[in-house]
């Protein structure tokens, strides 16, 4: 009985500590700036290859990640919850952003004096509308806390096929769940599953001739979950088209 009482006391103490901390587990420290203008029009394109972020479904809640976070494009599509880490310019609350770009290092400047994206600094260069939800724009740069969160997306994963015969380049966008993709496979009606290799950003490539075949795609996210989208592209697909599949 005494052991049960002690365990109960310990459990209550742990819950009290959790409440006192606001349930704040999993946060890391970094910094944030902003770019792209008040309408985020300057954030279009970028190192993930998403192009027009409005039509691609990412909107203005986006961020360019420093090299330490970008992971050579493997972090494209990952979602982060960010909050201001202190100072008079901070605003209450958090904002969720999707990684859509790289914030390149500037080795001509010190990491704490303009070289915000220099390794090994974890930094978010956020679209201005996202930044101004957690801090006043006049701050320029603020310390932040961040953590990975699930991505909430509408509709299915999108596959945009470009390239040419024997070089299929597929841009994978609108990925829910973990958001960032670690593996993609493609299957034609006359072939088995073939692994695609990471090309750049959110683009994956394959060297098979898949012309004239219905195409299926299998996407694996960083959390290990996999979604298979069967026959999303009909046999008459052509390069430049986008097709929607399943979702996490």
Curated annotation (Swiss-Prot):
Keywords: Cell wall, Cell wall biogenesis/degradation, Membrane, Secreted, Signal
Pfam family, one: DPBB_1
GO CC annotations on file: extracellular region; membrane
Residue ranges of every copy of the Expansin-like CBD domain listed in the record: 166-245
SUPFAM superfamilies referenced in this protein's UniProt entry, alphabetically: Barwin-like endoglucanases (SSF50685), PHL pollen allergen (SSF49590)
Swiss-Prot/TrEMBL GO biological process terms: plant-type cell wall loosening
Subcellular location, record wording: Secreted, Cell wall; Membrane
Intrachain disulfide bonds: none
Gene3D superfamilies: Expansin, cellulose-binding-like domain, RlpA-like domain
Keyword Ligase in record: no
Chief site of localization: secreted
Domain Expansin-like EG45 span(s) in chain numbering: 45-156
Family the entry assigns: Belongs to the expansin family. Expansin A subfamily.
PANTHER family assigned: EXPANSIN-A15
Its biological purpose: May cause loosening and extension of plant cell walls by disrupting non-covalent bonding between cellulose microfibrils and matrix glucans. No enzymatic activity has been found. May be required for rapid internodal elongation in deepwater rice during submergence.
Protein name: Expansin-A11
Species annotation: Oryza sativa subsp. japonica
């Amino acid at each position: 009985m005494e052991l049960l009482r002690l365990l109960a006391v310990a459990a209550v103490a742990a819950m009290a500590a959790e409440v006192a901390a606001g349930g704040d587990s999993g946060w890391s420290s970094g910094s944030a700036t902003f770019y792209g203008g008040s309408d985020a029009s300057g954030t279009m394109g970028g190192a993930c290859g998403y192009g027009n972020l409005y039509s691609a479904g990412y909107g203005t809640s986006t961020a360019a990640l420093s090299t330490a976070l970008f992971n050579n494009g493997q972090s494209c599509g990952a979602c982060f919850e960010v909050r201001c880490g202190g100072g008079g310019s901070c605003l209450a609350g958090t904002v969720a952003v999707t990684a859509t770009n790289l914030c390149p290092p500037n080795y001509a400047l010190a990491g704490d004096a303009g070289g915000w994206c220099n390794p090994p600094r974890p930094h978010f260069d956020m679209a201005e509308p996202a930044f101004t939800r957690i801090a006043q724009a006049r701050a320029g740069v603020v310390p932040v806390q961040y953590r990975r969160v699930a991505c909430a997306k509408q509709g299915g994963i999108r596959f945009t096929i470009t390239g040419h015969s024997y070089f299929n380049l597929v841009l994978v966008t609108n990925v829910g769940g973990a958001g960032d993709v670690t593996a993609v496979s493609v299957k034609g009606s006359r072939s088995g599953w073939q692994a695609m290799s990471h090309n750049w950003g959110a683009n994956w490539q394959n060297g098979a001739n898949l012309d004239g075949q219905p195409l299926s795609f299998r996407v694996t996210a960083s959390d290990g979950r996999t979604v298979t989208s069967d026959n999303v592209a009909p046999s008459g697909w052509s390069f430049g088209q986008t097709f929607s599949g399943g979702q996490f």
